[in-house]
Amino acid sequence: MRKPVMAGNWKMYKTPAETIAFFEKFRPLVEKSSHCEIVICPPFTNLAAAVDAVRGTSIRVGAQNVGWAKEGAFTGEVSGPMLNAMGVSHVIIGHSERRQYFNETDETVLKRTQAALEFGLTPIVCVGELLADREGGRTEAVLAGQFQKGIAGLTEQQFAKIVIAYEPVWAIGTGKTATPEIAADTHRAIRGQVREKFGKEAADAVRILYGGSVKPDNAKVLMGQPEIDGVLVGGAALDPVSFASIVNF
């Protein structure tokens, strides 16, 4: 059975002091939540505070991006070894906002994913379609293209260590949410692509998260779909009570 991953993406919010305050409220609310893996991904400036705040718990800390090189003249980038040395365990790669605003491509997603794995991080690799793709019936084709260019280049051993997050771009920060049935159907299609490339065992094992306006009032019904193995939460993960409610669906 696949253990759910409940991940929070803080994007560009909170200071280190606010991070500490969040965990002071959040930790007691999830101390018995052994049914899932909890990962919180704050901005780079808050990683040290977050790692200190979760010490002694099962809560994991993730980054929101990782450089594809070990070191070098890459202004603004943070490498896998740097994150690993801080105690970071996960990293979000290929989020739609990275693709939209910073020209992230499927090819750079693959490079970052390979680097994360090389340096001991668990990648949460994001895929998703635009509203025009959904309305035009191109969802599966778009996701297949992202999979082929951004994920299929991994070896079987590498693929076994990643988590996939399906984030319909039209549902991020809009208040719109894919119905549980639409989300499950899309997850099923992604799992089918995994089966074709990496085999049935890999398809049965990989965890596919849903991300797109996840809130306390829809988390339970989303998690009731057998194809959905967790969630990648944005705005609702900024509030400790709200995110704890999602974790404890």
From Swiss-Prot:
Gene3D superfamilies linked: Aldolase class I
Alphabetic keyword roster: Cytoplasm, Gluconeogenesis, Glycolysis, Isomerase
PROSITE patterns (alphabetical): TIM_1 (PS00171), TIM_2 (PS51440)
Catalytic residues as annotated in Swiss-Prot or TrEMBL: H95, E167
Biological process according to GO: gluconeogenesis; glyceraldehyde-3-phosphate biosynthetic process; glycerol catabolic process; glycolytic process
The protein's enzyme class: isomerase
Known pathway: Carbohydrate biosynthesis; gluconeogenesis; Carbohydrate degradation; glycolysis; D-glyceraldehyde 3-phosphate from glycerone phosphate: step 1/1
Cellular component GO terms, alphabetical: cytosol
EC id: 5.3.1.1
Transmembrane spans: none
Single GO MF annotation: triose-phosphate isomerase activity
Binding site for substrate: N9, W10, K11, G173, S213, G234, G235
Subcellular location: Cytoplasm
Top-level taxon: Bacteria
Known role: Involved in the gluconeogenesis. Catalyzes stereospecifically the conversion of dihydroxyacetone phosphate (DHAP) to D-glyceraldehyde-3-phosphate (G3P).
Family under the similarity heading: Belongs to the triosephosphate isomerase family.
HAMAP family: TIM_B
Quaternary organization: Homodimer.
Identification of the protein by name: Triosephosphate isomerase
UniProt source species: Solibacter usitatus (strain Ellin6076)
Gene name linked to the record: tpiA
